[in-house]
């Protein structure tokens, strides 16, 4: 790769070739380094790597800069300070080294790439003072261009004298010879490029951007174009956080040079008196000097993940095995991972270590932790992909630490993107099609979901997104792909990401009397794509409020002492990377248990008690499977055990069934009856006996008026479930003890009142409790169908007996009813 402005062979014999003595000395010393430097085993370290370069697809040798410093400090300093100048000579030294040992094609070029540079620079630190120096920079790839061939050294044919002019350097734009090399030919502009004899190399342009971690507060992230060549192409995808090793260079800004005004100026030259041009035609070069149309780009020779020891570019790396991950760790680090895997209290310790500054919300912590471990992605025989990533939505009142969860995950995960729903468009979340400034072709620019591929996408204010933007992520959440068909570009891109979303209730406060769907502004398809929903309600509780206040004050006053971590974040990252390599299988026992739990969820969904809960679908079954696999992964198990399924069911049950707990209206039937009476205009009322009027206060004593003003009797959902469970357990116990035992309604009421005898202090309270239990029994019988009144079939005795039977019927439990845990 001829990159430096190496001297061009002279145009004829009158121009001797200029030699660069410093670069030639570097070439000789670098060749000595390749031939003499030995590894820890005493063998020549780079000999085997160089022999692999004879394969057609290989042409780049990766050299450790630390080895170069160890071999010759002066050589390493010269290469670092004069990299762009000496780089072509280093490539020639490599070609000589390979040529001496193997037969290689004459026209094949070889390239050198450096890694393990001691210092890393930010994009913001790249100024003109670093032009030409060997530098390592880091950033996140946001746009990739397609790979195409680049002309690096052209062979031209003079159209006047047919002279062949070889090795004309191309300075990042199409460059013709200044003049024909034939001394008797004065041709300056009529040349033809011979593509068969010219040298081309693979060329790709990517755009990188500063990461959020290194961005100064309140600053807009800066971006830089990176040029990749040869083996470095296609080594970085949109969303990757990578280190690029190479040199900062100056190239002509072709996009500005190709504007209509610039093209017109290239043709306007000052002509002499005889019609000859007084200035030689130098094409765009002269214009570039005049207008200073140049820009900085980074020419990279090596690309590597920013943090390879923690999974590098992503949490999921399919090629890694447990053994390869172990080899990346030190002995002490591996012992720590092994110790964590044997921890009996690992589940709790990981939660507290990951979110040390958030008090309470243990269920949310567990759900987010399982999301980080993730399930096992699968592919069916027909090629259909089943996602393994877990999506979590946190819904809650303001100041319940929703955004803190998102921020913690964003900082912890090696590949996470944090965005706000209101400030994001559909293209910003998925992908945008933009026009390239130079080639004017359409290229794809990655959105948040693509940047978070194989990571976590944290979306705050999820409910504030426009409906059309919500629709854009339907496909990404379930199929984990993004399909684009616009501006002549048709592509299906990967978006294998877990989504952690935070949303506020519609009215600013979660209303327990309404369903989840009524509380948040999300469509049913989006809701069904979330595996876990967590509801955070800001309730007034003296004990909880004191604990939270104490925690916050401790954080402000003694931040170091108040943060108590069992494991450091680096320990958790290492353990997470190791545990994600496990692919647990579902055992037969666990399979039956999962089916049984899903049947319970479905039957409970259809019952009257939880009728307001959102629908339980097959997606919730898949959610249970993913959560079970995640639990097995966390404990480094190769098989999903029933205890893992039980915890997954508990979390799912917490987020689905307990999501809505409205108070139960025990006077519902009476209110409906009153509305019916009002609608009939008093037809069934007592018209013959008008209500007396109190003369002193002028108020009517009509019973119906009294009923209207009286508030309806309501019972908390948890209390209602407790009473119904007590009744069901008692009735079933009676059925088991005696074959023909059935309690009358009055006997059941008396039994309950006797059970709570210690809680009753007055006659008024006794009447109140009796009214409540009677209404609960009535609702369980006529609305929820938990209890069944025995019919009168076969008991047609005396009329007196039948009347008493209907007033006080026998009650039994519905055989299809499943008792809640």
Swiss-Prot record:
Region feature Disordered, mapped onto this chain: 676-708
Binding residues for ATP: 359, 399-403, 504
Keyword line: Acetylation, ATP-binding, Cell cycle, Chromosome, DNA replication, DNA-binding, Glycoprotein, Helicase, Hydrolase, Nucleotide-binding, Nucleus, Phosphoprotein
PROSITE patterns referenced in this protein's UniProt entry, alphabetically: MCM_1 (PS00847), MCM_2 (PS50051)
Phosphoserine: residues bearing it: 13, 219, 271, 689, 704, 762
InterPro entries reported in the protein's UniProt record: MCM (IPR031327), MCM6 (IPR008049), Mcm6_C (IPR041024), MCM_CS (IPR018525), MCM_dom (IPR001208), MCM_lid (IPR041562), MCM_N (IPR027925), MCM_OB (IPR033762)
MF GO annotations: ATP binding; ATP hydrolysis activity; DNA helicase activity; identical protein binding; single-stranded DNA binding
Compositionally biased tracts (Polar residues): 696-708
One of the GO biological process terms: premeiotic DNA replication
In-chain residues carrying the UniProt-annotated modification Phosphothreonine: 278, 791
Keyword Zinc-finger: no
Additional information: Early fractionation of eukaryotic MCM proteins yielded a variety of dimeric, trimeric and tetrameric complexes with unclear biological significance. Specifically a MCM467 subcomplex is shown to have in vitro helicase activity which is inhibited by the MCM2 subunit. The MCM2-7 hexamer is the proposed physiological active complex.
Full protein name: DNA replication licensing factor MCM6
Protein species of origin: Mus musculus
